[in-house]
From Swiss-Prot:
Its main location: cytoplasm. Belongs to the UPF0652 family. InterPro entries: DUF2009 (IPR018553). The keyword Zinc does not apply. GO terms for cellular component: cytosol; nucleus. It is found in: Cytoplasm; Nucleus. The keyword Cytoplasm applies. This is UPF0652 protein C22H10.08.
Length: 492
């Protein structure tokens, strides 16, 4: 499938406005025709042999200094940087092959016949990219090196030298089933049950067991009905399990946002102002916005609803990000944006997707507060990799907050409760204090080096929240967070 076909496929996976409310459960989002649509961007779960190749890839990239050596402004000419890129890529490919098959690796080192092993190298880099999508907290900086390797391999000069590039589309459930004429398995009436996530929270053991058995029966029904000479029962099950994985992924990303919206609506009203817990902010002390209590309340709630919609489309955004970074027609240039050297590259397809999502959020709001500017391919968000990384911070910031409130509700440590009563006037008072602080200073337009990159733009809303998270250690309630089990906002 060529790049244009992939682009259209990925963009078509984003649900039309009438299908979205932003509040449905992951299971409901994956009902019948929607399931088929979403499968276009859901990665297939890695198999055992693929995991062994993944370990090989990550080990090779971990010891590579590729990005440090090529992403620097010190090269005197493009030709010298190109030579360094080619040297770095061939070194890693050689290392991977030597570790995988010593004899073949020695031949590769001697004859430099990389093209003979093109499919192997494409496969191993596809495995790494596919794994990252379903495991965003894994790989760390290794993923950046991985993507920049693939990106640089798309350059005509490097393709000519190697005889191939490292890009292979991420293997999705849709593509896997489509190649085996088994897409109708996702239209089966039992598909929703077979792919649902079973959540144990606040449920009885008998109810959980009932769901487990119903899910197992549904999986077996579909596997028996749709297997053929082209696809085994086990492969059908594997596809269903992959979709179930994606349901868990969505719940992890979306639930903290939905729960925080519920907390905000429970503790605050836009029309009632408590002087002690007012949300009003002025453009002073780092803040770049000036909002009344009413305006700030709606600004925060709208931002949270926007993030909820973005997290609901995160698989589509991941797929488009992968496509943007490896697009040879969109050249990047190295820039220094005062946060290090970055590759700045246009992101037209992600922009289309984000504009659709933003339009949905605006249609769900009576009045949109703040800017509608989307930073992409500029100094604020230089490329698709940093775009995805930025929005994956949302659950990392909000999950510890939601868990803290849950921990406070169940807290029975008398010493800690006495401290909370003495220092903060009780646990409910403390919860409202933390929420007020988050809603005021996590959405005040702060956190960037200049007015253009901050403020109320779509990107700036998240910049402010991350700035608040980075300064959490300065808050009066920080020690309570630590005593309640809080560690950090880094996703661990």
């Amino acid at each position: 499938m060529d790049a244009e076909a992939l682009r259209n496929l990925y963009l078509s996976s984003i649900l039309p406005n009438e299908s979205k409310t932003g509040n449905e459960s992951p299971e409901k989002k994956f009902s019948s025709p929607v399931l088929l649509q979403r499968a276009k961007v859901i990665p297939l779960r890695l198999e055992y042999e693929e995991r062994k190749l993944l370990h090989l890839l990550t080990a090779a990239l971990d010891v590579s200094d590729y990005t440090d050596s090529v992403d620097t402004l010190s090269f005197s000419s493009p030709a010298k940087r190109l030579a360094q890129q080619l040297k770095g890529i061939t070194a890693v490919l050689s290392g991977i092959m030597v570790a995988y098959d010593y004899k073949v690796g020695q031949e590769l080192l001697e004859h430099k016949n990389f093209e003979q092993h093109a499919e192997f190298f494409k496969k191993i880099f596809e495995i790494g990219r596919r794994y990252k999508v379903l495991n965003p907290n894994r790989l760390g900086s290794t993923y950046g090196k991985l993507m920049y390797f693939v990106q640089d391999s798309m350059r005509p000069e490097i393709q000519d030298a190697l005889g191939f590039n490292l890009f292979k589309p991420i293997l999705t459930v849709y593509e896997f089933l489509n190649e085996r004429d088994a897409l109708n398995a996702l239209e089966d009436p039992y598909a929703e049950i077979a792919t649902m996530e079973i959540v144990a929270e606040n449920r009885s053991r008998s109810a959980i067991q009932k769901d487990i058995k119903a899910k197992e029966r549904a999986v077996e029904h579909i596997a028996k009905k749709y297997y053929s000479s082209k696809i085994t029962k086990e492969k059908v099950r594997w596809c269903l399990y992959s979709i179930a994985d994606s349901n868990s992924y969505l719940r992890y990303n979306r639930d903290p946002i939905a729960k925080l919206i519920g907390l905000v609506e429970a503790y605050f009203s836009p029309d009632t102002v408590d002087d002690e817990f007012t949300l009003a902010i002025d453009a002073i002390n780092g803040s770049r916005l000036k909002h009344s209590h009413y305006k700030q309340y709606h600004y925060v709630v709208q931002s949270l609803h926007l993030w909820l919609l973005i997290m609901g489309e995160i698989f589509s955004l991941w797929a488009l990000s992968d496509l943007e970074l490896t697009n040879p027609d969109m050249e990047y240039k190295l820039i220094d944006n005062n946060q290090g050297i970055h590759r700045m590259q246009p992101c037209p397809n992600i922009r289309i997707a984000m504009e659709r999502i933003l339009r949905t959020a605006q249609e769900q709001s009576e009045t949109w507060i703040g800017s509608s500017t989307i930073h992409l391919g500029d100094t604020a968000v230089p490329n698709a990799l940093l775009f995805i990384d930025k929005y994956m911070q949302v659950p990392r910031i909000l999950t510890p907050l939601v868990l803290l409130f849950k921990e406070l509700d169940s807290l029975n440590d008398h010493s800690l409760l006495n401290y909370i009563d003495t220092a903060f006037g009780g646990r409910e008072y403390l919860k409202k204090t933390i929420l007020t602080d988050f809603m005021r200073f996590g959405f005040d337009g702060s956190g960037a080096d200049n007015w253009f990159d901050a403020g109320s733009c779509i990107d700036g809303r998240l910049t402010s929240a991350w700035n608040w998270a980075n300064n959490i250690h300065t808050k009066d309630y920080y020690r309570v967070l630590l005593m309640s089990g809080f560690l950090s906002f880094n996703g661990e």
